[in-house]
Regions:
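Structured, hydrophobic secondary-structure cores that serve as assembly/anchoring elements
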Residues: 1-218
Length: 218
């Protein structure tokens, strides 16, 4: 693994720094500032990263199995096929595009069941789908694109954090312009432990801890 560097940079006039009702330094180091933005990009790369100058996301990994979808929107048979290709001993979690939220809640099975996705009656319990917890996220591709539905066991994903996010400021970078500058730096890499899917004992049937819903079958 080779840690990839992500850098953020911004400036503000010294008047803004002095007159701001909040501490800009604290804001930029918080979840809504540069540190939060880098954390968002890191999660995005673990899902959709190409591996070129950034982590290799599960969607583009060689170990991932892509299951052809039956139609355009995800269907119940699609999800069953994904579970069938998932590592039996895996501790899977569904990652589903936020753009599919309404579609998933209204999904019906072949017997006309109203919904296969609902929250547990216990307070704080996550939504469950076919026995696996569900996370809706905007970090997945938009609906009807490969990877809009992912079933993953992140124990099989290797993350190498070489440098935690640091946010530093200086008044000397743009001193003659009466400005303060901030720089955020983070170094990380990530990729699945596996380079290809696993096989059952028959040596033919593939399974994987990473399964995505792919393109429509032709």
């Amino acid at each position: 693994m080779v840690a990839h560097k992500l850098i953020g940079y911004t400036t503000a006039s010294d008047e803004l720094v002095a007159d701001s009702a909040i501490s800009l330094a604290d804001f930029l180091s918080g979840p809504l500032g540069m540190a939060g933005g880098i954390a968002w990009m890191e999660d995005y790369a673990f899902i959709q990263g190409t591996g070129a100058g950034q982590p290799l996301g599960v969607i583009n990994a060689g170990a991932t199995i892509s299951v052809a979808r039956v139609g355009t929107d995800p269907t119940y048979p699609d999800l069953c096929n994904m579970v069938e290709n998932f590592l039996p001993s895996g501790r899977g979690v569904w990652f589903i595009s936020q753009s599919l939220y309404s579609e998933m809640l209204q999904m019906s099975g072949p017997t006309g069941n109203a919904s296969y996705l609902w929250g547990n009656a216990q307070s704080g319990a996550p939504n469950m789908l076919l026995g696996f917890p569900v996370v809706f996220t905007e970090k997945c591709p938009l609906r009807n694109n490969p990877g809009d539905v992912i079933l993953a066991d992140w124990r099989y994903y290797l993350i190498g954090d070489r440098q935690a996010t640091t946010v530093e400021s200086t008044q000397f970078d743009l001193w003659r312009y009466d400005k303060t500058s901030w720089r955020a730096v983070h170094r990380v890499d990530g990729q699945p432990w596996l380079s290809q899917p696993l096989y059952y004992q028959d040596g033919t049937t593939q399974i994987s801890p990473f399964v995505i819903l792919g393109s429509k079958s032709s």
